[in-house]
C-alpha cells in the first residue's frame, strides 16, 4: 500500500480529538483571497526523529469526514508534498518546537479545518485544528455612531449702546452755564445785602454809645 493511501486510511480510522501534545494557533482565521496564511503547530514533546503531517478537512469533523494530506516535515528531507497539491503554494518549515504550514495565494476552495498530526505507535495524535475561511472581501468594522449633544443657547444681555459724539449738546452746556451765573449773581447779592445790614447795625450801635 502506498504511504499516502495508508496515511489517509489511518486518519479515517482514528478517533479525532484535540491533544495537548500538539497546540495549534490560531484556532480560527479569516483572510482575503490571494493572501498568505501561516498556521502554527507547537509540539510539547521531542520530535527529533519524527515527522509532522498537515491535513485538511473541508467539512465539519465527524466519524466519516475526509482528510486530505497536504505535506509533511521530515528532519532529514525537509518538506515532502502530496502529489495532489501545488508545491509552490504549500510549504512546511520548522522554527524550534513550532512547525509552520505556509499557504500562499489562497482561494475560497482552500477553506477548511487544518490539522497537524504525528504518527505514533499505535495511535495518531492530532492538534485541535485551525479553521481557515477564505473570502473575497473582508467585513468592515462599523464605526460606532456618536450622539450629537444639542448646543445650549446662551442668552446674552443687550449691551448698552455707547453714545457717539460729544456727551452734552450746546443747548445743555448753555443751560448749565446760565445756571452757574444765576447762582453766582444770587450769591453776590446775598453777600452785598449781608454787608449792608452789618454796616447799618454798626452805625446804630455807635449812635447808642455816644
Swiss-Prot record:
GO terms for molecular function: coreceptor activity; MHC class I protein binding. It is found in: Cell membrane. Glycans are attached at residue 102. It is a single-pass type I membrane protein. Phosphorylated as a consequence of T-cell activation. Palmitoylated at the cytoplasmic tail and thereby targets the heterodimer CD8A/CD8B to lipid rafts unlike CD8A homodimers. Residues 22-170 are extracellular. Disulfide bonds join 41-116. Its main location: membrane. Keywords: Adaptive immunity, Cell membrane, Disulfide bond, Glycoprotein, Immunity, Immunoglobulin domain, Lipoprotein, Membrane, Palmitate, Signal, Transmembrane, Transmembrane helix. GO terms for cellular component: cell surface; plasma membrane. Residues 1-21 form the signal peptide. Residues 192-210 are cytoplasmic. Integral membrane glycoprotein that plays an essential role in the immune response and serves multiple functions in responses against both external and internal offenses. In T-cells, functions primarily as a coreceptor for MHC class I molecule:peptide complex. The antigens presented by class I peptides are derived from cytosolic proteins while class II derived from extracellular proteins. Interacts simultaneously with the T-cell receptor (TCR) and the MHC class I proteins presented by antigen presenting cells (APCs). In turn, recruits the Src kinase LCK to the vicinity of the TCR-CD3 complex. Forms disulfide-linked heterodimers with CD8A at the cell surface. Interacts with CD3D; this interaction couples TCR-CD3 with CD8. Interacts with LCK. This is T-cell surface glycoprotein CD8 beta chain. It comes from Pongo pygmaeus.
Amino acid at each position: 500500500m502506498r504511504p499516502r493511501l495508508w496515511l489517509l486510511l489511518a486518519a479515517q480510522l482514528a478517533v479525532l480529538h484535540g491533544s495537548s501534545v500538539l497546540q495549534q494557533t490560531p484556532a480560527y482565521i479569516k483572510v482575503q483571497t490571494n493572501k498568505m496564511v501561516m498556521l502554527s503547530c507547537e509540539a510539547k514533546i521531542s520530535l527529533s526523529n519524527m515527522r509532522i503531517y498537515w491535513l485538511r478537512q473541508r467539512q465539519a469533523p465527524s466519524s466519516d469526514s475526509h482528510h486530505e494530506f497536504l505535506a509533511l516535515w521530515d528532519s532529514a528531507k525537509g518538506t515532502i508534498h502530496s502529489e495532489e497539491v501545488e508545491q509552490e503554494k504549500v510549504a512546511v518549515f520548522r522554527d524550534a518546537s513550532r512547525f509552520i504550514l505556509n499557504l500562499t495565494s489562497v482561494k475560497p476552495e482552500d477553506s477548511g479545518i487544518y490539522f497537524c498530526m504525528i504518527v505514533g505507535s499505535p495511535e495518531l495524535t492530532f492538534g485541535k485544528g485551525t479553521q481557515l475561511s477564505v473570502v473575497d472581501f473582508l467585513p468592515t468594522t462599523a464605526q460606532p455612531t456618536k450622539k450629537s449633544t444639542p448646543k445650549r443657547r446662551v442668552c446674552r444681555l443687550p449691551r448698552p449702546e455707547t453714545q457717539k459724539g460729544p456727551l452734552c449738546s450746546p443747548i445743555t452746556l448753555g443751560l448749565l452755564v446760565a445756571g452757574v451765573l444765576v447762582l453766582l449773581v444770587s450769591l453776590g447779592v446775598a453777600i452785598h445785602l449781608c454787608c449792608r445790614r452789618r454796616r447799618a447795625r454798626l452805625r446804630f450801635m455807635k449812635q447808642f454809645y455816644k
